[in-house]
C-alpha cells in the first residue's frame, strides 16, 4: 500500500473528475499516492469514461462503481469498506475529497509526508474558493452553542425563511469585509474541517474514528468533528497545505430547494446523534 490514499466521488459529469486527476498527476511524490474513484449512480458511459481515464494515468488507481447514488460521504464509506484497510500497516494518510478540487500546490504531498500522523489525527488544509478567493477553512473553530442552535431552528423553518436569512447574512458579510480587513486564519486546533477536502491520518481510525454516513449530504463536517471529540482526537488547521475548490457559481431556485431539504435532514440527524 502506498503512503497516501486519495478517495474522490464522481457523480455523472466525468469531466470534473478528469480535471481533478490531471491536477493530481502533476504533483511531487505522486508516486506515493493511490487514487480511488467511486462512481456514484454509475452508468455504462460514466464507468467507461472513468476507467479510460484511470488506465491512462501514471497513478496507481482503482475504480469502484455503485448503481445507487452513494452521495459524497457514503461514497467515501463505500471505498473504505471495499478496500478493507489494515490501518496499522496501510497508508499513513487517507484523503477524502470532492472531485471539484484542484491541486495547485506542487509540493502538497511532499509537505504532507513530512507530518507526524500520530500527532495530526485530522487535518483541515487551506481550501481556496476559485469563485471568491476566500479560504473555506477553518470551517468551525468551536462547537455550535445555544445561539447557534437557535439560529438553525429558525433557519430551517421553511425554504423562504432560510433563503432570506442566507442572503441577508451574505450581504452583511460583504459589507463587513469591505470595511474591515479580514484577518488571516492562524494554524492550530479547530472544531470542524470544511468537508470538501479532509485529511485523516491512519491513527484517526486506529483510535476509534470512523466515517458516519447516516445522512445523504452536508453532515460530514460536524460528524467528523464530534467523532474526533468523542475519541479524544484532534483536528488541526494547517494553512501551509493548500488546494483550490471550484465552487458553484450560482444557486438557482431548484438547487436551493435541493440544498435546503438535504441540509435540514442532515442537521436533524446530527442534532439527534451528536448535538
How should each PLM-predicted stretch be described?
Residues 165-170, 222-275:
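Active-site-adjacent helix/loop segment of glycosyltransferases
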Residues 185, 191-210, 214-241:
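A short, conserved alpha-helix in the catalytic core of glycosyltransferases
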Residues 23, 39-50, 68, 98:
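A conserved acidic beta->alpha catalytic loop
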Residues 90-102:
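Short beta-strand-to-loop acidic/aromatic patch adjacent to the donor-nucleotide binding site
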Amino acid at each position: 500500500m502506498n503512503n497516501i490514499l486519495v478517495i474522490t466521488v464522481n457523480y455523472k459529469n466525468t469531466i470534473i473528475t478528469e480535471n481533478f486527476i490531471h491536477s493530481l498527476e502533476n504533483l511531487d511524490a505522486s508516486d506515493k499516492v493511490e487514487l480511488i474513484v467511486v462512481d456514484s449512480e454509475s452508468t455504462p458511459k460514466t464507468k467507461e469514461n472513468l476507467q479510460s481515464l484511470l488506465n491512462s494515468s501514471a497513478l496507481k488507481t482503482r475504480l469502484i462503481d455503485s448503481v445507487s447514488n452513494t452521495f459524497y460521504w457514503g461514497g467515501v464509506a463505500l471505498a473504505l469498506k471495499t478496500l478493507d484497510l489494515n490501518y496499522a500497516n496501510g497508508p499513513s494518510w487517507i484523503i477524502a475529497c470532492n472531485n471539484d478540487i484542484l491541486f495547485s500546490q506542487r509540493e502538497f504531498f511532499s509537505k504532507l509526508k513530512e507530518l507526524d500522523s500520530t500527532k495530526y489525527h485530522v487535518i483541515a488544509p487551506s481550501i481556496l474558493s476559485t469563485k471568491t478567493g476566500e479560504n473555506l477553512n477553518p470551517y468551525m473553530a468551536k462547537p455550535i452553542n445555544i445561539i447557534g442552535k437557535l439560529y438553525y431552528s429558525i433557519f430551517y423553518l421553511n425554504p423562504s425563511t432560510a433563503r432570506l436569512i442566507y442572503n441577508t447574512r451574505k450581504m452583511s458579510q460583504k459589507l463587513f469585509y469591505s470595511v474591515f480587513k479580514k484577518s488571516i486564519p492562524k494554524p492550530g486546533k479547530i472544531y470542524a474541517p470544511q468537508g470538501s477536502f479532509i485529511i485523516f491520518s491512519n491513527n484517526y481510525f486506529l483510535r476509534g474514528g470512523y466515517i458516519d454516513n447516516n445522512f445523504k449530504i452536508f453532515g460530514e463536517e460536524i460528524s467528523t468533528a464530534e467523532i474526533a471529540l468523542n475519541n479524544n482526537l484532534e483536528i488541526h488547521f494547517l494553512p501551509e497545505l493548500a488546494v483550490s475548490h471550484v465552487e458553484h457559481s450560482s444557486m438557482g431556485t431548484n438547487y436551493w430547494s435541493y440544498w435546503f431539504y438535504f441540509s435540514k435532514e442532515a442537521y436533524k440527524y446530527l442534532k439527534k446523534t451528536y448535538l
